[in-house]
Amino acid sequence: MAIAHLATEYVFSDFLLKEPTEPKFKGLRLELAVDKMVTCIAVGLPLLLISLAFAQEISIGTQISCFSPSSFSWRQAAFVDSYCWAAVQQKNSLQSESGNLPLWLHKFFPYILLLFAILLYLPALFWRFAAAPHLCSDLKFIMEELDKVYNRAIKAAKSARDLDLRDGPGPPGVTENVGQSLWEISESHFKYPIVEQYLKTKKNSSHLIMKYISCRLVTFAVVLLACIYLSYYFSLSSLSDEFLCSIKSGVLRNDSTIPDSFQCKLIAVGIFQLLSLINLLVYALLVPVVIYTLFVPFRQKTDVLKVYEILPTFDVLHFKSEGYNDLSLYNLFLEENISELKSYKCLKVLENIKSNGQGIDPMLLLTNLGMIKMDVIDGKVPMSLQTKGEDQGSQRMDFKDLDLSSETAANNGEKNSRQRLLNSSC
């Protein structure tokens, strides 16, 4: 009976979750995978294009080229280029062949992309500091309590199994209802399921979901605005990148040796046009994904909590959320951090056994597993008894060796005394 009790201890200790020495739930993901993907693409792509634009500027050295007369020195030609580059945003000094076009958009194109990258990162920054700390503490509490619910169920099965082992085999009528009597145990194991009550309170809360929806709406608005700007810039750059620039101002106003205007061309417009097209296509593909993130919390998914229906007193039907509330968002984040939830893995195994075992209760199957191991151990010689027998056998062998050595020493002593007597008689 002691060996059977020890075997049951080993079975349930394997399933019982151990308390880790390091902090639990260290790598919680506080951002959904689809939101993280949108942020990385929406912010990372403009930064990549900006780096390419500045690399092109460094390799070429200048962003504008103006046709100066041959009588101008290289310093005068450089002055014309610098003056016309600085006057791009001034309409009075410029005359374009295609009319009054805002040519300053070409000059500030990389900086506008940088502005969009900053605006698209603001929702992620707001979520990190305004919502993530509260979400992290709630998720740690919920996941820890779910593990405790699982541990209490295992302890209940263990206590029920110990009770059956102490009582011994019952009459046939009792063994038929063993599946029902197994859970007729003390309510102290399942009293006050605080995680269930806490999750139900999230159905009436909407603080977290409002922050989430606000972040997604801001992201959608900025991406849509960026698409409009990039479309306009692409159409603008395809019209003309050449203009006439006049440098007659100040002391040069009345200088007759200086032409009235210079023909100038923006060199980087072709590169900017290609970069704007790439960014526009990616953002256009990103718009449906951003719209999808707005409706992600509306999915009524309780797959993670549904596994816990195996345990007593845990009813997942009460966790069906309707509309947008915090509970729908917590379900998504539990699914996102499912790798950190150890009890889910164990219960998933038991659920698979239940589905393939013709409706067998997983906890009952677990106790049967303990009985099978108990029978196997009973069929063998216990290790403690075997070692004890080996110790006794070794002690007996030591005593036999001592007896043999003492007999040998006595015989040798007799032989020595006889030899001395013979020598003295001679």
Curated annotation (Swiss-Prot):
Keywords: Calcium, Calcium channel, Calcium transport, Cell membrane, Disulfide bond, Endoplasmic reticulum, Glycoprotein, Ion channel, Ion transport, Membrane, Phosphoprotein, S-nitrosylation, Transmembrane, Transmembrane helix, Transport. The record marks 375-378 as: Cleavage. GO terms for molecular function: actin binding; actin filament binding; ATP transmembrane transporter activity; calcium channel activity; gap junction channel activity; leak channel activity; monoatomic anion channel activity; protease binding. The modification S-nitrosocysteine is found at residues 40, 346. Glycans are attached at residue 254. It catalyses: Ca(2+)(in) = Ca(2+)(out); ATP(in) = ATP(out); K(+)(in) = K(+)(out); chloride(in) = chloride(out). S-nitrosylation inhibits channel currents and ATP release. Expressed in the eye, thyroid, prostate, kidney and liver. Abundantly expressed in the CNS, including hippocampus, olfactory bulb, cortex, cerebellum and white matter. Residues 1-40, 128-216, 299-426 are cytoplasmic. One of its GO terms (biological process) is positive regulation of interleukin-1 beta production. InterPro entries: Innexin (IPR000990), Pannexin (IPR039099). One of its GO terms (cellular component) is endoplasmic reticulum membrane. Residues 62-106, 238-277 are extracellular. The modification Phosphotyrosine is found at residue 198. The chain crosses the membrane at residues 41-61, 107-127, 217-237, 278-298. It is found in: Cell membrane; Endoplasmic reticulum membrane. It is a multi-pass membrane protein. Residues 407-426 are annotated as: Disordered. Disulfide bonds join 66-264, 84-245. PANTHER family: PANNEXIN, PANNEXIN-1. Belongs to the pannexin family. Homoheptameric. Ion channel involved in a variety of physiological functions such as blood pressure regulation, apoptotic cell clearance and oogenesis. Forms anion-selective channels with relatively low conductance and an order of permeabilities: nitrate>iodide>chlroride>>aspartate=glutamate=gluconate. Can release ATP upon activation through phosphorylation or cleavage at C-terminus. May play a role as a Ca(2+)-leak channel to regulate ER Ca(2+) homeostasis. This is Pannexin-1. It comes from Rattus norvegicus (Rat). The lineage of its organism: Eukaryota, Metazoa, Chordata, Craniata, Vertebrata. The gene is Panx1.
